């Protein structure tokens, strides 16, 4: 890990054997769950991406997807076909811009396009500027939360896992998912390393202010379930 000015960091990773995992290496029969959280895949696993999505759909497993550079570089038809089957899509600004081919400064246009591509909940994180989320009926926003931090490592993953966990625990309550996501991410920021600050079950956490607007209002996003 290389650290720079202002606690910014670059992480150099050697994935080893995980780069070589192929379809035949996955114990499909053991994947018995209600949800799959598909994080960025690389190496040979990137070629198994569609198989994982199709397996989940066939077995009525819900999907949370946080695609990485490898998935976003797949042919557009392949990527869109996969995303059309997911329940929660998590992206940062740059990833959302790559996927939609729209500048991340044009938030309305990005969400209209993302809501066309994905039938589920779409999340776009904006770093220190907060997050915007659409469920096709409402657009939820949280402005950046000022906090003292020790280390940013893992904060994005803490946000994503926190949201999905809260969404599952609350049977699909977006606002609870947002609160748990921010609570987990902000807690992660207070400790060194990616895991040391993660919330434990029942632990209290900081609440944030959520702004909620109807998608039909001012063309904020594409109305999927109005």
Question: Where are the language model's segments positioned?
Answer:
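Acidic, amphipathic alpha-helical patches
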Residues: 26, 79, 149
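Residues that scaffold the ATP/ADP-binding catalytic core of kinase and kinase-like folds
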Residues: 12, 99, 188
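Conserved beta-alpha-beta core of the PfkB/ribokinase-like small-molecule kinase fold
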Residues: 35-109, 129-131
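Structured loop/turn residues at beta-strand edges in well-structured enzyme cores
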Residues: 31, 77, 84-85, 117, ...
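Short, acidic/turn-prone active-site loops that include or flank metal/cofactor-
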Residues: 15-18, 68-70, 94-95, 145-148
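Conserved N-terminal subdomain of the carbohydrate kinase-like
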Residues: 1-38, 204-215, 219-226
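Structural motif
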Residues: 8-11, 35, 62, 88, ...
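Conserved phosphate-binding/catalytic region of the ribokinase-like
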Residues: 72, 104-226
């Amino acid at each position: 890990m290389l650290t720079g000015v202002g606690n910014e960091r670059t992480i150099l990773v050697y994935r080893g054997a995980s780069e070589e995992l192929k379809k035949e290496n996955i114990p499909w029969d053991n994947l018995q769950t209600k949800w799959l959280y598909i994080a960025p895949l690389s190496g040979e696993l990137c070629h198994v991406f569609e198989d994982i999505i199709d397996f989940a759909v066939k077995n009525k497993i819900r999907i949370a997807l946080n695609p990485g550079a490898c998935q976003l570089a797949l042919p557009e038809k392949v990527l869109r076909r996969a995303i059309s089957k997911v329940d929660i899509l998590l992206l940062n600004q740059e990833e959302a811009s790559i996927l939609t081919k729209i500048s991340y400064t044009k938030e309305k246009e990005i969400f209209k396009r993302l809501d066309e591509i994905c039938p589920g909940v779409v999340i776009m994180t904006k770093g220190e500027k907060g997050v915007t989320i659409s469920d096709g009926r409402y657009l939820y926003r949280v402005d950046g939360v000022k906090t003292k931090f020790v280390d940013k490592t893992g904060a994005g993953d803490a946000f994503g896992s926190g949201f999905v966990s809260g969404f599952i625990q609350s049977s699909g309550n977006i606002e609870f998912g947002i609160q748990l996501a921010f609570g987990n991410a902000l807690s992660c920021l207070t400790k060194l390393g990616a895991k040391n600050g993660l919330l434990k079950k029942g632990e209290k956490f900081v609440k944030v202010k959520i702004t909620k607007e109807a998608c039909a209002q001012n063309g904020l996003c594409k109305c999927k379930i109005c």
